[in-house]
Amino acid sequence: KGIEDIASGDDMLLMQKITAKNKNAVKYLKSEKVIVETLPVNTIGEFFQQRIRWASKADQYQDKTLFPVLLWVYLVNFLLLLLFVLIMINYNTNYYLKLFLILFACKTIVEIYFLIPVAYFFKKQNTLWVFPFLQPMHILYTVIAGGMGKFGSYQWKGRKVK
């Protein structure tokens, strides 16, 4: 009850409702035996629609520790994109370039610290080499999907959702 009007994320939102009633009712099982694989989407458009859909429910999570983390990630990516634009239009380039490089390095270090053990757990460590090259795309799609998730609409299961 209370999540019927949300188009997706019912599984995650249900787990949070259960946890709100009993903090010990939901546990995480880190085991290769229970990994559930989902087929990837087929196109870039579907990828963005999926990410926008995910972002649209960010403020619906009952776990109040999650939203500040999501907001922080969004703001860091937004700032990186803004700095890049300022550098491209030659606005105080030296200062903004230094700031961009420092923030970009910090973001990359934090994310790789998280990503390495995850990649090894899922036996995907051979894909880690592409991580630095995909950072610009990650910044861009995070800003677009986050903004569209909050203020835009998306297609899901054949219907437009706002």
Task: Go through each PLM region and give its residues.
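Membrane-interface alpha-helices
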Residues: 23, 151-162
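General alpha-helical segment detector with a strong preference for membrane-spanning helices
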Residues: 14-15, 61, 81, 111, ...
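Membrane-embedded multi-pass helical conduit in multi-pass membrane proteins
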Residues: 66-69, 73-152
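Catalytic donor/gating beta->alpha subdomain of glycosyltransferases that bind UDP-sugars
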Residues: 2-66
